[in-house]
């Protein structure tokens, strides 16, 4: 089943609104915590070798949707290229990787630092990247 099909089974909790190198070339959660402003922060690291990196390097901002797949408890993130003010900024790192700092999302999803993606898929026509993370409770 493709990740795009999984989208239909996902109960979206967060919908569109306002570092460390992974040796395996996978997308990884690298940092999270509260900023001084009280906002939560979750930074994704997307390695330079990743095809997602190649796609996102052409994009300045992404809308982020995130949800939990009801059957498995896995977490699906959907990043869609946008010009909107509400998008999150895509930051290119010196290492060639890319990070996206996503506010207010970390704790609602139960994502923890160090979690590595299970798989990802790019839908070029809709300028969207799907990233599937394992169920954080299956450790």
Indicate where each model-derived feature is located.
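Short, structured coil/loop segments at alpha-helix boundaries
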Residues: 49, 69, 107-113
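Functionally constrained cores in energy, signaling, and assembly domains
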Residues: 50-51, 65
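Pepsin/retropepsin-fold aspartyl endopeptidases
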Residues: 98, 104-105, 109
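Long, compositionally biased stretches
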Residues: 1-40, 57-99, 113-139
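Short, well-ordered beta-strand segments enriched in hydrophobic/aromatic residues
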Residues: 42-49
